[in-house]
């Protein structure tokens, strides 16, 4: 069954906008998956160590027949192809791809939590998501406009021409 999936994209190394575009191009090649929409891009302050570049962020909507862990594996393979190194939590990275929502599913697996944990506190996730689905209700019952109202538009700005 086709599921609508929202994936967060982020990069702060090696030409971040190009990294995100390369990831979107890779989404087009995923089996049983179609890229439906992409939010405007934003620039945001890093969550982790302050001595790193600001991030470029966005959200993509995909329709997929892949199982959640199969999609996660495919996204992590894209990260690796683009030079992702997992050494410092919340450190700089060429590409970060996170499954935010997977249809109406609630998942609490060792490798995957859906809705994505802490998304409600991350402006760089909520605002691009709202660009794609402004009235979205999450599978756990939370309503995106309420999450936005509780998450100030701080440390983030929409990129011109994005």
UniProtKB/Swiss-Prot annotation:
Superkingdom classification of source: Bacteria
Catalytic reaction list: 6-hydroxymethyl-7,8-dihydropterin + ATP = (7,8-dihydropterin-6-yl)methyl diphosphate + AMP + H(+)
GO-annotated molecular function: 2-amino-4-hydroxy-6-hydroxymethyldihydropteridine diphosphokinase activity; ATP binding; kinase activity
Entry keyword annotation includes NADP: no
Keyword set, alphabetical order: ATP-binding, Folate biosynthesis, Kinase, Nucleotide-binding, Transferase
Pfam families reported for this sequence: HPPK
EC number: 2.7.6.3
Protein's pathway: Cofactor biosynthesis; tetrahydrofolate biosynthesis; 2-amino-4-hydroxy-6-hydroxymethyl-7,8-dihydropteridine diphosphate from 7,8-dihydroneopterin triphosphate: step 4/4
GO annotation terms (biological process): folic acid biosynthetic process; tetrahydrofolate biosynthetic process
Record CDD domains: HPPK
Enzyme type, top EC level: transferase
SUPFAM superfamilies: 6-hydroxymethyl-7,8-dihydropterin pyrophosphokinase, HPPK (SSF55083)
Nucleotide-binding among keywords: yes
Signal peptide segment: none
InterPro entries assigned to the protein according to its UniProt record, in alphabetical order: Hppk, Hppk_sf
Family, per entry: Belongs to the HPPK family.
Role: Catalyzes the transfer of pyrophosphate from adenosine triphosphate (ATP) to 6-hydroxymethyl-7,8-dihydropterin, an enzymatic step in folate biosynthesis pathway.
Protein name as it appears in the record: 2-amino-4-hydroxy-6-hydroxymethyldihydropteridine pyrophosphokinase
Organism: Pseudomonas aeruginosa (strain ATCC 15692 / DSM 22644 / CIP 104116 / JCM 14847 / LMG 12228 / 1C / PRS 101 / PAO1)
Taxonomy of the source species: Bacteria, Pseudomonadati, Pseudomonadota, Gammaproteobacteria, Pseudomonadales
Gene that this sequence comes from: folK
